Amino acid sequence: MPPKPAEKKPSSTAGKAPASSAGKAPAEAAKKTSKAPAKSGEKKKATKVRKETYSTYIYRVLKQVHPDTGISNKAMAILNSFVQDIFERIATEASKLASYNKKSTISSREIQTAVRLILPGELSKHAISEGTKSVTKFSSSK
C-alpha cells in the first residue's frame, strides 16, 4: 500500500480582512507563492498556493455585531482555528452517523444530530434553530 500524503497544517497567522476585500473569497485573501520547477533556460513561474480561511467571514460578522471594533491577527488565527475544529468535529460525527445508517450521503438530519451530540445543552438548541433558519432561507431563495 502506498504511503499517505502528508497533511498540510494551517499556519497560525491569519490576516485581518480589510474592508475593501469584502467581495473576495477567503482563499484569495491569504496566498503564498512557491516556485514551480522549470525547464533549463526558462524562467521559473511562481504558482499560487491557496490557503483557505474563514477570516473574511469572521470579520464580516464582527462588523455586523460591533461595527467600531477591530480584531488582531492573533485573535483572528484563534477564531479561524476554532471554526475549523468545530467544522471538522461536526463533519466527522455526521459521517459516522451516515455510515451507521448505511447511507453514503450526509443530509441535514445527520448534521443536526451531530450538532446535538457535539454541542452542549442550550448551545446546540441555538445552533440547530439558526441552521434550520438558514436552510429555510436558502431553500426559499431557489
Curated annotation (Swiss-Prot):
Record GO cellular component, one term: nucleosome
Any matching Pfam family: Histone
Localization in the cell: Nucleus; Chromosome
Residues found modified as N6-acetyllysine: K8, K9, K24
Keyword annotations from UniProtKB, A to Z: Acetylation, Chromosome, DNA-binding, Isopeptide bond, Nucleosome core, Nucleus, Phosphoprotein, Ubl conjugation
Domain of life where this protein originates: Eukaryota
UniProt modification remark: Monoubiquitinated by the UBC2-BRE1 complex to form H2BK123ub1. H2BK123ub1 gives a specific tag for epigenetic transcriptional activation and is also prerequisite for H3K4me and H3K79me formation. H2BK123ub1 also modulates the formation of double-strand breaks during meiosis and is a prerequisite for DNA-damage checkpoint activation. Acetylation of N-terminal lysines and particularly formation of H2BK11ac has a positive effect on transcription.
Sequence ranges of Basic and acidic residues compositional bias: 1-10, 40-50
InterPro entries in the record: Histone-fold (IPR009072), Histone_H2A/H2B/H3 (IPR007125), Histone_H2B (IPR000558), HISTONE_H2B_site (IPR055333)
PANTHER family from the UniProt entry: HISTONE H2B (PTHR23428)
Assembly and oligomerization: The nucleosome is a histone octamer containing two molecules each of H2A, H2B, H3 and H4 assembled in one H3-H4 heterotetramer and two H2A-H2B heterodimers. The octamer wraps approximately 147 bp of DNA.
Name under which the protein is recorded: Histone H2B
